[in-house]
Amino acid sequence: MRQRITYIQKPSLPFHPSQTTLTRDSLYVESLDAAREERVTFSFDELPSELWQVLRQCHQLHIRWASERAFEAVSPLSSRISPGLHVFYSPVEAGRAKRDSEGREPLCTLLKKVFDDELRCESPEKSFITPPILSKRFASTTAYQFYELLPSLGNLVTYIQQKFCGTDDKCHQRAASILSADSVDINYDSISHALTMSGFWSQAPGEQGWTETIGKHEGGTDKVEIGLLGAEPASEPEEIKVGGLLAVVGQDEELKPTLFSFPSRHHPLHEDATYSVTFPPPTGLHPTMTISIAPEALKEPPRRPDATCALHAYLTLPSKLFGDKYQLSTTDPLFLKSHNLASLRAVAGETDLEAPDWSISRWGSNWLLELASPSESDEVAEEWNITIPLHLRYLPPSESGYQPASVPWPVVFWACSAEDGTKMGVNPFDRINLGWEGLFGPRTMFYQLHPSPSPEGGNLVEELEVPVLTLKENSGIFNSQVIELGTFAVISIGFLWVLWKLGLVARSSGIRPQHQRNPGKRDKAE
């Protein structure tokens, strides 16, 4: 097992060498105000059998989870996804995966056991969607994609404690810390045969910063790498420069200074470059998502003169909600201008306009929209509003007459072309398989806007109330029994009316005797 812990400080935050103490077998950190990423890599023989039995059928498996809480993503860990659980999967062989001894599909069975037994996951063929491939050169795009809004990782913590920790109390504590993480990534590919799990905390759980002792593992065979880093101004627009201190616990006697730069796909914007999402009431069955972008976020990112940039939004819509791809893909300039949209770049998943939610087997749909932005000559003093017309599917009836629908916030970013020849190689902080970055070319750079929810709400998920059929008795004329009886009565009356009309037609068009012509007159005429 290999462990890497990285603390990332803002340049404005104070740091003193006395806050860290490195000994022969541990590193002590005291009151460190920083973001924290922990990454653990397991080899195949360190995994439980039920886990590697599923992984050996996977060519790629990438799991992403983000909290519903708003958090700050610092450079170089600035990439974002919509809140919830995202699964990206490619099988080793095309076709159906081998089922277990009880006839269950192995991947969905494992996902339910690890994350939540209520996941709407039956099999990749039935529950996953197939993402579009707009850039064939971007090899990271997987064959299947799954999503579900998952507020907590409590089941994952329990699974790790039972399958990996045993009676190790420190391991139990480290696993429990996942509950306060802002994002968690799990990666596996058939080339490396290694499972990597990483967690990101934008800040320490307490107000005093990080205070902890990181020791080397018993036996001394596992490697523990520590980094205390901070981003610095880079000389090139496509690069990120990082400097700080590094150490390997149990090998190094002191922290070693370091400074390095690398091309990066993901870059943060100024902290004032924010956006918020609302659904103006009343939402009804045709809600409109409004993305309000701060004026600071409308300025194009720093780029080379020959580069082009465009503002985008990537929507993750559960099956209850969908867009009309025919409406959003229009080239009508009046419609696009009225909503501040430029074009629909990509769509994948359920887009049936008439299907009710209970007939949908796949989880939902993804939408990549290019957004219109004001020209440089236009001065925008207030927020720039993007409106996206959406639609709700028919949902099962309820006693209250309403059903809840949770909608995660979209990811909003600038996508800019990099200089020809720029190699976006894998760097220590690179993050791919996010769903949306695979829809662009391999040398595209992304500049992330920061979600900024209202102080009253605080979450990156919007809650809608969907009007449905009322099951409750004595609730007026719109309860289920009245509608069922009324429907039966109308159909019966209509059927009887049709029979009555057919009877009248039959009576009025009875067979009449034909008059025989006089053959004599015919002969006389001849």
From Swiss-Prot:
Keyword Cell division appears in the UniProt entry: no
UniProt source species: Emericella nidulans (strain FGSC A4 / ATCC 38163 / CBS 112.46 / NRRL 194 / M139)
GO cellular component terms given for this protein: endoplasmic reticulum membrane; glycosylphosphatidylinositol-mannosyltransferase I complex
Membrane-spanning intervals of the chain: 485-505
Encoding gene (name): pbn1
Main location: endoplasmic reticulum
InterPro entries: Pbn1 (IPR042322), PIG-X/PBN1 (IPR013233)
Cellular compartment(s): Endoplasmic reticulum membrane
BP terms from Gene Ontology: GPI anchor biosynthetic process
Glycan-carrying positions: N385
Keyword annotations of the record: Endoplasmic reticulum, Glycoprotein, GPI-anchor biosynthesis, Membrane, Transmembrane, Transmembrane helix
Family: Belongs to the PIGX family.
Name this polypeptide is given: Protein pbn1
Pathway participation: Glycolipid biosynthesis; glycosylphosphatidylinositol-anchor biosynthesis
Cytoplasmic side: 506-526
Topological domain spans for side Lumenal: 1-484
Membrane topology, as annotated: Single-pass type III membrane protein
Domain of life: Eukaryota
Function: Required for proper folding and/or the stability of a subset of proteins in the endoplasmic reticulum. Component of glycosylphosphatidylinositol-mannosyltransferase 1 which transfers the first of the 4 mannoses in the GPI-anchor precursors during GPI-anchor biosynthesis. Probably acts by stabilizing the mannosyltransferase gpi14.
Claim: Membrane is one of the keywords in the record: yes
